[in-house]
UniProtKB/Swiss-Prot annotation:
Record has Glycoprotein as a keyword: yes
Catalysis: reaction(s): [protein]-peptidylproline (omega=180) = [protein]-peptidylproline (omega=0)
Record EC number: 5.2.1.8
Domain PPIase cyclophilin-type as annotated: residue spans: 37-195
This protein's record includes keyword NADP: no
UniProt-listed Gene3D superfamilies: Cyclophilin-like
Molecular functions (GO terms): cyclosporin A binding; peptidyl-prolyl cis-trans isomerase activity
The family this protein is said to belong to: Belongs to the cyclophilin-type PPIase family. PPIase B subfamily.
Coiled-coil regions listed: none
Subcellular location field: Endoplasmic reticulum lumen
Entry function: PPIases accelerate the folding of proteins. It catalyzes the cis-trans isomerization of proline imidic peptide bonds in oligopeptides.
Native source species: Saccharomyces cerevisiae (strain ATCC 204508 / S288c) (Baker's yeast)
Descriptive protein name: Peptidyl-prolyl cis-trans isomerase D
């Protein structure tokens, strides 16, 4: 009788634990409000397109920064013709330094840097789009895309989107030949970038917040003139 009882308890515990992990594994990602893309060349070779979905309701300021830099045609203020300057296999690919093309530069649409918005979304799978930084509250324009789950980055870097299509391109970049600084020997270039789709915001508060963020960015740009 005791053996049956303990067997039942063990079975229940296993089922309970499985249910918890199953719930965690099936947790939904934040709503996607923008779809943008990068077309990538490795030297002169076209290697394809990366399509990214942005979490504009979860991280509206971070998304607005990335979105504006993606659609920009200003050669001094945008991702067009910038490079992926840091590539580490089984970790991530990093880009966004359009001022120095080395990892020491870049800037946001709100000025040089802006604060960490939140750490609600985790680096829990390949394809997470997250902000690179130099420490707390130092977000500029540099970003990275994970190629594996990176839980050690949680609470330190702001995740604001994910790769929807083109992980094959991400993995291609991940495996290009690099030098001792993890910089690709042959440049990996964003030869085209832009918007595929923006989802209208039904939530009035969210729409209002987005307009306020745009106004803040516009004011920051005006102050730099």
């Amino acid at each position: 009788m005791k053996l049956q009882f303990f067997s039942f308890i063990t079975l229940f515990a296993c089922l309970f634990t499985t249910a918890i992990f199953a719930k965690e594994d099936t947790a939904e990602d934040p709503e996607i409000t923008h779809k943008v893309y990068f077309d990538i060349n490795h030297g002169d070779k076209q290697i394809g397109r990366i399509v990214m979905g942005l979490y504009g309701l979860t991280t509206p300021q971070t998304v607005e920064n990335f979105y504006q830099l993606t659609i920009s045609r200003d050669p001094k203020m945008g991702y067009l013709n910038s490079i992926f300057h840091r590539v580490i296999p089984n970790f991530m690919i990093q880009g966004g330094d359009f001022t120095h093309r080395s990892g020491i530069g870049g800037k946001s649409i709100f000025g040089n840097t802006f604060k960490d918005e939140n750490f609600d979304v985790k680096h829990d799978k390949p394809g997470r789009l997250s902000m690179a930084n130099r420490g707390k509250n130092t977000n500029g324009s540099q970003f990275f895309i994970t190629t594996v789950p990176c839980p050690w980055l949680d609470g330190k870097h702001v995740v604001f989107g994910e790769v929807l299509d083109g992980m094959d391109v991400v993995h291609y970049i991940e495996n290009v030949k690099t030098d001792s600084r993890n910089m690709p020997v042959k440049e990996v270039i964003i030869v085209e970038s832009g918007e595929l789709e923006t989802v209208p915001l039904d939530n009035k508060d969210a729409a209002k917040l987005q307009e306020e963020i745009k106004a803040e960015a516009s004011e920051a740009a005006h102050d730099e003139l």
